[in-house]
């Protein structure tokens, strides 16, 4: 039977979309096929479903998502009664349920007066669907005692109507009340109650939303700038010195278009990072001169300047009526919402309570979710030497918002801050270090000179070397100030990896450093090694690569079944190349008799059960290999790229293995998600019994 989860509420303004998004994230980690159903819907686009469809790559036909609109439902109820309405909605729900393992049901929004008792309506729908219920209570603007009473009453109401209440969620609670309220509710209710604090970034409208609502014209700014949250509104009418003192981080400056001094002053303050602003909104439909706009564009590239026709007072009223929304056009809000949900909800316990069927398949999305979850479970510090690179900054924002790991970014601190401000990126909670001016430079120079004394490196030379961001980052890892390092988006592989070879070096039981790719196919993840480092490993080195790759696979939840690849299977071939693979296979068996391994074996026999049944019947590995070891770099690199292109696989990596501490190299074409994944992998590699890094 399909399991379903019904997220509902008791009134408007509860910020329930945070919970709906969080539950969807949770379900897609565990289950491949997740459907969505909204029993009643208003006319117009469903922005939350569009977000879910884009973020989770849902193939579900949008026409099946909705039961019916409110007007249709009201008419049906009036003409044929409530039972007929329920029967129709249940039939439409089951059209979705039959095709999915789990269905997330999005309850009504309490915005329609045609159904005066929407709580009872949601409760009955949940019961008819056989769905477990997660009621959400809004706490904004209420005392802790009021929220406690409302939550208790909501629980009793849904339970009294026969619902299977999975957990309660209280959202938008004042931060100072959250901890005490959570403790009191935990002792009051028979089910878990998760209390989420109010998060200003979620309720703040974006500059794009404001522009659309007010019918504004964009004079300056790019898409990234328009996506910034307007966390505050500062109205400019004072003289410049007083106006500058009033600026707050993330504020939208609202001023008449003829106040060129305030426009330039606000953007100059943004450029200096004191403080970074969301943008400038010009009233009275007055456009500054071209000279002022040119100066503004140079002061703060990408920062939006928008013109509207209204005067300041009507504009202010409209601004204060706007509230931020989660939708496909606000990915930053989605990351913030998920970070909030994952920080305050025991997702492991909630998933157990859902009792969602575990899938035998492991899709690319499920693998990526598991990476973030595993990294978050034991947070580590990762240093990113390329702190001024745009993609790295965007990835850092995602990692920080989701609470995946702690971050240190290297580079000129003023440049990092300015670049982040220009991109509208919040790096709060990260550590910024300039290797050139850092107090660590002297001690790092001495350390590096000691390590490279046999190469004749003096302290003076070392002082210059450690100013390089990759050497500095590697020394942070070596000295326990970071747990791992990720670089390479603008540096060569050699520039990224060479410092690790010189400083961190290999594990005691490892002869070489190698790499693997996680190849995320449609329904499983395979581990390919080595496709990036060793050109032509000998039998002993190939054995080392196989053992390392098996350990890496297991660390990331892939049960290792090793296929030592060659152009022939079993004893059918001969020659130096196949003999090398045969010898390496035997060495693995001698070294680790607990590992399942087969070799030499051809690729098709390794992964296709039908071929394996003919060529190697009875093998524990053939037809179901999960770790594929290539005989040389030429074969491995070409194969992973061929599979990536022809099979549409997502390649995550390369993941370096064999170093005493994790350092990973990015492709110079890496996308933001690639960087996020690689940082998460690095953090997971650092999760060991050793002490965590200590930030300086």
Swiss-Prot record:
Pathway: Metabolic intermediate biosynthesis; acetyl-CoA biosynthesis; acetyl-CoA from acetate: step 2/2. It holds the Pfam family DRTGG. Involved in acetate metabolism. Residues 367-696 are annotated as: Phosphate acetyltransferase. Its EC number is 2.3.1.8. It catalyses: acetyl-CoA + phosphate = acetyl phosphate + CoA. One of its GO terms (biological process) is acetyl-CoA biosynthetic process. Keywords: Acyltransferase, Cytoplasm, Transferase. One of its GO terms (molecular function) is phosphate acetyltransferase activity. The N-terminal region seems to be important for proper quaternary structure. The C-terminal region contains the substrate-binding site. It is an enzyme of class 2 (transferase). InterPro entries: DRTGG, P-Actrans_bac, P-loop_NTPase, P_AcTrfase, P_AcTrfase_dom1, P_AcTrfase_dom2, Phos_Acetyltrans/Butyryltrans, PTA_PTB. Its main location: cytoplasm. NCBIfam families: PRK05632.1 (NF004167), PRK09653.1 (NF007233), pta (TIGR00651). It comes from the Bacteria. GO terms for cellular component: cytoplasm. It is found in: Cytoplasm. This is Phosphate acetyltransferase. The keyword Cytoplasm applies. In the N-terminal section; belongs to the CobB/CobQ family.
């Amino acid at each position: 039977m399909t399991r379903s989860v019904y997220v509902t509420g008791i009134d408007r303004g509860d910020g329930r979309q945070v919970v709906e998004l969080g539950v969807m994230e949770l379900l897609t980690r565990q289950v491949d096929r997740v459907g969505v159903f909204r029993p009643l819907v208003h006319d117009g686009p469903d922005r939350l479903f569009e977000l879910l469809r884009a973020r989770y790559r849902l193939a579900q036909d949008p026409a099946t998502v909705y039961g019916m609109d409110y007007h249709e439902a009201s008419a049906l109820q009036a003409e044929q009664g409530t039972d007929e309405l329920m029967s129709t909605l249940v039939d439409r729900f089951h059209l979705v349920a039959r095709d999915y393992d789990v269905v997330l049901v999005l309850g009504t929004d309490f915005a329609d007066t045609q159904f005066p008792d929407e709580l009872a309506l949601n409760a009955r729908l949940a019961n008819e669907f056989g769905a477990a219920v997660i009621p959400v209570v809004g706490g904004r603007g209420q005392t802790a005692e009021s929220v406690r009473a409302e939550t208790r009453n909501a629980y009793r109401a849904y339970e009294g109507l026969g619902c299977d209440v999975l957990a309660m969620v209280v959202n938008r609670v004042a931060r100072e009340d959250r901890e005490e309220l959570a403790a009191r509710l935990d002792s009051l209710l028979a089910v878990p109650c998760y209390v989420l604090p109010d998060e200003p970034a979620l309720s703040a409208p974006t500059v794009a939303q404001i522009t659309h609502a007010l019918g504004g014209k964009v004079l300056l700014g790019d898409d990234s700038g328009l996506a910034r949250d307007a966390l505050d509104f500062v109205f400019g009418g004072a003289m410049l010195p007083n106006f500058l003192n009033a600026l707050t981080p993330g504020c939208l400056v609202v001023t008449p278009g003829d106040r060129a001094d305030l426009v330039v002053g606000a953007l100059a303050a943004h450029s200096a990072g004191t403080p970074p602003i969301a943008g400038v909104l010009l009233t009275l439909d007055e456009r500054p001169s071209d000279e002022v706009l040119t100066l503004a564009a140079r002061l703060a590239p990408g920062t939006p300047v928008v013109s509207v026709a209204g005067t300041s007072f009507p504009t202010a009223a409209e601004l204060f009526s706007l509230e931020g929304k989660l939708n496909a056009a606000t990915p930053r809000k989605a990351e913030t919402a998920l970070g909030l949900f994952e920080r305050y909800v025991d997702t492991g316990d909630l998933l157990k309570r859902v009792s969602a069927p575990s899938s035998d398949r492991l899709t690319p999305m499920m693998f990526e979710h598991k990476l973030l979850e595993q990294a978050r479970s034991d947070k580590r510090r990762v240093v990113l030497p390329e702190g001024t690179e745009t993609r790295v900054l965007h990835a850092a924002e995602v990692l920080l918002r989701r609470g995946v790991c702690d971050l240190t970014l290297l580079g000129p601190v003023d440049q990092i801050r300015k670049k982040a401000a220009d991109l509208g990126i919040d790096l709060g909670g990260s550590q910024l270090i300039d290797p050139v001016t850092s107090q660590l430079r002297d001690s790092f120079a001495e350390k590096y000179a000691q390590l490279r004394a046999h190469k004749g490196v003096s302290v003076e030379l070392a002082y210059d070397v450690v100013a390089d961001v990759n050497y500095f980052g590697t020394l942070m890892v070596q000295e326990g100030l970071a747990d791992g390092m990720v670089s390479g988006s603008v540096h060569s592989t050699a520039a990224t990896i060479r410092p690790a070879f010189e400083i961190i070096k290999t594990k005691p039981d490892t002869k070489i450093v190698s790499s693997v790719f996680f190849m995320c196919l449609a329904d499983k993840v395979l581990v390919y090694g080595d496709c990036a480092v060793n050109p032509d490993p000998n039998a002993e080195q190939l054995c080392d690569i196989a053992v390392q790759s098996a350990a890496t696979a297991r660390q990331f939840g892939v049960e290792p079944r090793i296929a030592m690849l060659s152009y022939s299977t079993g004893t059918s071939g001969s020659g130096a190349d196949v003999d090398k693979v045969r010898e390496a296979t035997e060495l693995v068996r001698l070294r680790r008799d607990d590992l399942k391994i087969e070799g030499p074996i051809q690729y098709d026999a390794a992964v296709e059960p039908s071929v394996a049944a003919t060529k190697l019947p009875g093998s524990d590995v053939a037809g179901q290999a999960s770790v594929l070891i290539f005989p040389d770099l030429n074969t491995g690199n070409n194969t992973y790229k061929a599979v990536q292109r022809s099979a549409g696989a997502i390649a995550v990596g390369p993941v370096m293995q064999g170093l005493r501490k994790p350092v990973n190299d990015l492709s110079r074409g890496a996308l933001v998600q690639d960087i996020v994944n690689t940082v998460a992998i690095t953090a997971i590699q650092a999760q060991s019994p050793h002490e965590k890094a200590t930030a300086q």
